[in-house]
Curated annotation (Swiss-Prot):
Gene label: MT-ATP6
Domain of life from the UniProt record: Eukaryota
The protein, known as: ATP synthase F(0) complex subunit a
Major subcellular site: mitochondrion
Gene3D superfamilies: ATP synthase, F0 complex, subunit A
Assembly and interaction partners: Component of the ATP synthase complex composed at least of ATP5F1A/subunit alpha, ATP5F1B/subunit beta, ATP5MC1/subunit c (homooctomer), MT-ATP6/subunit a, MT-ATP8/subunit 8, ATP5ME/subunit e, ATP5MF/subunit f, ATP5MG/subunit g, ATP5MK/subunit k, ATP5MJ/subunit j, ATP5F1C/subunit gamma, ATP5F1D/subunit delta, ATP5F1E/subunit epsilon, ATP5PF/subunit F6, ATP5PB/subunit b, ATP5PD/subunit d, ATP5PO/subunit OSCP.
CDD domains cross-referenced by the UniProt entry: ATP-synt_Fo_a_6
Pfam families the record matches: ATP-synt_A
Catalysed transformations (reactions): H(+)(in) = H(+)(out)
UniProt subcellular location: Mitochondrion inner membrane
GO CC, one annotated term: mitochondrial inner membrane
MF-aspect GO terms: proton channel activity; proton-transporting ATP synthase activity, rotational mechanism
Amino acid sequence: MNENLFSSFATPTLMGLPIVALIIMFPTLLFPSPSRLINNRLVSTQQWLAQLILKQMMLMHSPKGRTWSLMLISLIMFIGSTNLLGLLPHSFTPTTQLSMNLGMAIPLWAGAVITGFRYKTKASLAHFLPQGTPIPLIPMLIVIETISLFIQPMALAVRLTANITAGHLLMHLIGGAALALVSISPTTALITFIILILLTILEFAVALIQAYVFTLLVSLYLHDNT
């Protein structure tokens, strides 16, 4: 029986019950909160990365936007660790599920937009009509800008889902090809296996880059509204 190509993206269950909630909570165990005065190297590295990311993202924000710093650093750490854990054999990647990514994107986007309408009402409404727009084009541009605003969370979720899913599918296909070529052409199988190793290294980079891109876009939406 041939294995379904998308079987690895099915939500895992235990005794008929979905255990995706436990999988989502698992990355939090990788970031402990030590009680010792002197941290070890792992915790020090995590803190250094968090400070570096915050410095890059919070530089452009106003004091109101910087109150979101803890949420943004938690978001990038969660998505990055989830993507990396999904590269382990026989594991499940929650970020390949569009429903989960929409569950992250919509509240974050809505929070940024609501913040903008609450504290910068005129500036937020001005985004719907660019300055210098000819009068006949005003209705059409307002509709276009409104659609572009509401499509932002969908673009956030689809981008993350598509990139992670495509990488996993490509690794699955190349891995299956390498296994099938072992008995036919060992030399070709070796070349395919080397390509698979290089692709795996690339996927590690993609996992971190997609976490950064998702968080950066949320940060930009927040910057536009604070």
